[in-house]
């Protein structure tokens, strides 16, 4: 709940910790859900008008709540870095729109070879980054970009192009993009 995040920021401020990365989406491991992606728990925790029905029903933040949270954290000198984790850990997105899921690597991975994947993720990021008063208030945004397959050269190159695309998209809104370098 938001009250937990607010308490966490207060504790961080007390100990002079100044950065909190908030994962807005993630999912469980399918082996704990009968090896079935359809049963595997996944959630996206931020209100979305672009994709009605995407937002988790068992706990989420309204846009206003999240904006207020970021601004309040800033008064305590704590920067909130929102993360929309793509192209892996994306089961919440593929539960919502199954056709963008990877059949080869698992439904918690976006299919990097489908144009609809880019359209979906572009629109999602734009919803939170565009305008004079964007939902993501700070300058830094995290996009995940880790734990995707490196087994095939064509997939690695597509992953590189995918990452480059989102670097340009996020930075095009004047934000600094953060991502986790794949190992």
What is each residue range found by the language model?
Residues 84, 142-149:
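Short acidic/histidine-rich active-site segments
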Residues 147-166:
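Active-site cleft segment of glycoside hydrolase catalytic domains centered on the general acid/base Glu
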Residues 179-183:
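Conserved small/polar residues in nucleotide/adenosyl-binding loops
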Residues 106-111, 148-152:
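Glycine- and acidic
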Residues 63, 104, 146, 154-155:
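Long alpha-helical, hydrophobic tracts
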Residues 76, 173-174:
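Helix C-cap/helix->beta junction micro-motif
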Residues 1-109, 116, 122-140:
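Feature activates predominantly on carbohydrate-active enzymes
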